[in-house]
Design a protein with these regions (language model features):
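Glycine-rich, proline-tolerant flexible connector loops at the mouths of alpha/beta enzymes
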Residues: 1-2, 20-42, 207-217
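Active-site-adjacent loop and "lid" segments of alpha/beta metabolic enzymes
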Residues: 35-43, 81-86, 142-149, 170-195, ...
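Alpha-helix-loop-beta-strand connector modules within alpha/beta enzyme cores
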Residues: 8-16, 37-61, 96-102, 152-164, ...
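A short alpha/beta connector and helix-capping loop motif
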Residues: 2, 6, 10, 70, ...
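Catalytic alpha/beta core domains of metabolic enzymes, predominantly
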Residues: 100, 104-206
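Catalytic beta/alpha-barrel core
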Residues: 39-41, 55-69, 78-91, 102-113, ...
Length: 250
């Protein structure tokens, strides 16, 4: 399934001339319940991602959750991802930075946009400037998230690309009786709003049949939905880029 999904995503992005990085998790270490599906584990998971790179010919990224994973992951992945819940973990950020690989740091739901600067410093302190920041919503009371699009220009001021995670941003954390729920119907609205706000890329969870996904199904989009979003996003992106010189700076 991983190879087939990667190939279909590659083909969609190729048709639209949109750069694409394939993300899959070898371990979903932050699931709500002990009974929740976590993935194949680091050894088998990295083997699968290595196959995706070799056979589908795309770059790959995955989460690292502990410094013990960084070395092995860095030998396979083209980019390392720091999960939102771990974005303040100094040792993990330092270890990821020392690999020299690009590092995508997801902003925690509990973190203000301006407070991502220390996370950047922990990586640049390892002489690694290859950083991406990802906005994925902020806690809004219990079991809910809200997306403040001001976060995008705030985090862009430091000169690093900012990505918007449109699918995790519609998640309803732990609201599904032992799992997270979600409101996938709002993914297009948030994705297109983020592009209009100036984000440099979109993070989107995609599954052929979201209702059958073993993780995050309630906030996923299917392939047809993805293509619709990307087509619209590309048109908005063109407008935003054409008027970028007129955009006020913070």
């Amino acid at each position: 399934m991983c190879l087939a999904h990667a190939a279909q995503l590659r083909d969609i992005c190729s048709r639209l001339s949109i750069p694409f990085i394939f993300k899959a998790s070898y371990d979903k270490a932050n699931r709500t319940s002990l009974q929740s599906f976590r993935g194949p584990g680091i050894k088998k998971g990295l083997q699968i991602l290595r196959q995706v790179k070799a056979r589908v010919k795309v770059a790959v990224i995955s989460d690292v959750h502990d410094i013990s994973e960084v070395r092995a992951a860095g030998q396979v992945l083209d980019m390392l991802q720091i999960p939102a819940l771990l974005c303040r973990q100094t040792d993990l950020l330092v270890a990821a930075g020392r690999t020299g690989k690009p590092v995508n740091v997801k902003k925690g739901q509990f973190v203000a946009p301006l407070d991502m600067k220390p996370a950047i410093d922990k990586i640049t302190g390892q002489k690694n400037e290859r950083i991406i920041l990802t906005e994925r919503g902020s806690s809004f009371g219990y079991n809910n998230l809200v997306s403040d699009m001001r976060a995008i220009p705030i985090m862009k001021q430091w000169g690093y690309p900012v990505v918007f995670d449109a699918t995790h941003s519609v998640q309803l954390p732990s609201a599904g009786h032992g799992a997270s729920a979600g409101e996938a119907q709002f993914v297009p609205t948030l994705a297109l709003s983020a592009v209009a706000a100036g984000c440099d890329g979109l993070f989107l969870e995609v599954h052929a049949k979201p209702a059958q996904a073993l993780c995050d199904g309630p906030n996923m989009v299917d392939f047809a939905g993805l293509e619709r979003i990307l087509r619209q996003a590309k048109e908005i992106w063109k407008i935003v880029r054409s008027s970028a010189s007129a955009r006020p700076r913070l």
